[in-house]
Structures are given as structure tokens and as C-alpha cells.
């Protein structure tokens, strides 16, 4: 599924059913040695997907460490993103010569828990939710797009980005009660000076998909 919302040049892999014999890379085991089983499965599954995607780029199946704020440490010359939710793990990677950053996120297609929306959204976003006639869980889609935005932002800035510091707008290209797809635009509301020598960040554009009970969002920033 995730590959349908990523551009050419980005490789991806996803895992819906967790193989019982799947094990952590030996060099990653210490990172989850004290983790509960669910956390272990999410960690191992997402990094398994990462190595499958790296292979499609022609990269070796290396260990993927954890950096500041838990961000994955990719091989030199590679950018990427990991995501997981109940029943789903995925990774997307690309060569840095083609894309400056990638951010993906996955969420269950269900409404946000009570009280969460106000803490993750801006007034214009809540107004859009009120006035948009759709059977889709657009509140969770908004949250998912904010998460992908942060994942694309962090590697280029090494700075926190709050939910209130990005304004997300959506285009719905197709939608029914339980599936849909379209695009989104993330306008960044804080200075976006970067650490890669590139132009400052002003906004991100991405795509979204709702299918098989999941919401997926993806940004590939060139």
C-alpha cells in the first residue's frame, strides 16, 4: 500500500502479518533488550522492512541504530523513515542525492481518542473538519499527516516541531466510507533553517491513502 503514495526513486516495504521467526539484527538487540513484547515486535518489524527497502536501493542489510529523539540512523547517503501501528509496519528509503528527507506515518482508520484533537490541531484545521462532509476519519488523517511532517522535518533541522507549528490542508481525490486517497500540504509556521546546506524549509507536500483499515501518509522532499 505505502508504495502507491511514494514517488519514483523511493523504495519501501511493509509488513502486515508478523512472522514468528523474525528476529532483531544482532547489533540492534541491545536497543530493545528491556522492551515489552509489543515494542520489540514493532521495532524489529519496522527495521526488517527497512532492510528490505535498502536492498532495493542496492544497499547492504545493515543495523539501523537510534539517534536523538529515537530517530533511525541511516547508512551514509541514505534518507528514510519508519512507521508502525497495530497490525502494520513499514519503511521508506531513498538516496540523499535524490531526496533531502522522507517522512511516513501509519495510523488505524479510527477516530482520535476523546480530547486529543484539540491538542494536535489548529483552529483552521478544526474548522475544515467541521465543514467537510466525509465518512472518513479525517481527524486521524490530520494527526497522521502531522506525524509525517515531523518525521520529514527532524532530519533536516534536528529541532522539535510542535503540532501547532504546521498547518495542514487536504485535497480528497477519492473517498468512501472506508477508503480514500489524496494529497496534503504542510505549511510550516516556524523558521526552517536546515543542517544540510539546502534551502530553508517553508512547506512539505505529501500524499495520503486510507485502505484496509489503515491511514498512511507520506512526504518525499526533494
From Swiss-Prot:
What's its EC? 2.7.8.7
Coiled-coil segments on the chain, per record: none
Substrates-to-products reaction catalysed: apo-[ACP] + CoA = holo-[ACP] + adenosine 3',5'-bisphosphate + H(+)
Q: Which cofactor does it need?
A: Mg(2+)
**By its UniProt entry, which InterPro entries does this protein fall under?**
4-PPantetheinyl_Trfase_dom (IPR008278), 4-PPantetheinyl_Trfase_dom_sf (IPR037143), 4PPT_N (IPR041354), Enbac_synth_compD-like (IPR003542), P-Pant_transferase (IPR053566)
The broad enzyme category this protein falls into is transferase
Question: Which Gene Ontology terms of cellular component type are present?
Answer: enterobactin synthetase complex; plasma membrane
- What domain of life does the native source organism fall in? Bacteria
Residue positions binding Mg(2+) = 105, 107, 147
Q: Which GO terms describe its biological process?
A: enterobactin biosynthetic process
Q: Name one GO molecular function term.
A: holo-[acyl-carrier-protein] synthase activity
Q: Which UniProt keywords apply?
A: Magnesium, Metal-binding, Transferase
Q: How does it assemble?
A: Monomer.
Q: Please describe what this protein does.
A: Catalyzes the transfer of the 4'-phosphopantetheine moiety from coenzyme A to a serine residue in the acyl-carrier domain of carboxylic acid reductase Car, thus converting apo-Car to fully active holo-Car. Is probably also responsible for the activation of other proteins with phosphopantetheine attachment sites.
The entry's family comment says: Belongs to the P-Pant transferase superfamily.
Return the protein name.
4'-phosphopantetheinyl transferase Npt
- Native organism is Nocardia iowensis
Amino acid at each position: 500500500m505505502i508504495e502507491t503514495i511514494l514517488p519514483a526513486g523511493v523504495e519501501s516495504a511493509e509488513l502486515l502479518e508478523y512472522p514468528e521467526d523474525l528476529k532483531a539484527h544482532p547489533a540492534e538487540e541491545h536497543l530493545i533488550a528491556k522492551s515489552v513484547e509489543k515494542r520489540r515486535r514493532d521495532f524489529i518489524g519496522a527495521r526488517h522492512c527497512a532492510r528490505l527497502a535498502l536492498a532495493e536501493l542496492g544497499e547492504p542489510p545493515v543495523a539501523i541504530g537510534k539517534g536523538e529523539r529515537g530517530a533511525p540512523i541511516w547508512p551514509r547517503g541514505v534518507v528514510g523513515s519508519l512507521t508502525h501501528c497495530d497490525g502494520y509496519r513499514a519503511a521508506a528509503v531513498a538516496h540523499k542525492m535524490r531526496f533531502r528527507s522522507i517522512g511516513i506515518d501509519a495510523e488505524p482508520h479510527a477516530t482520535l481518542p476523546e480530547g486529543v484533537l484539540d491538542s494536535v490541531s489548529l483552529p483552521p484545521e478544526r474548522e475544515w473538519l467541521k465543514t467537510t462532509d466525509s465518512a472518513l476519519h479525517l481527524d486521524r488523517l490530520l494527526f497522521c499527516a502531522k506525524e509525517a511532517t515531523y518525521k520529514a522535518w527532524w532530519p533536516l533541522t534536528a529541532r522539535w516541531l510542535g503540532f501547532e507549528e504546521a498547518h495542514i490542508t487536504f485535497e480528497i481525490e477519492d473517498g468512501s466510507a472506508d477508503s480514500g486517497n489524496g494529497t496534503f500540504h504542510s505549511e510550516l509556521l516556524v523558521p526552517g533553517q536546515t543542517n544540510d546546506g539546502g534551502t530553508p524549509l517553508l512547506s512539505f507536500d505529501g500524499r495520503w491513502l486510507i485502505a484496509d483499515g489503515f491511514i498512511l501518509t507520506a512526504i518525499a522532499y526533494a
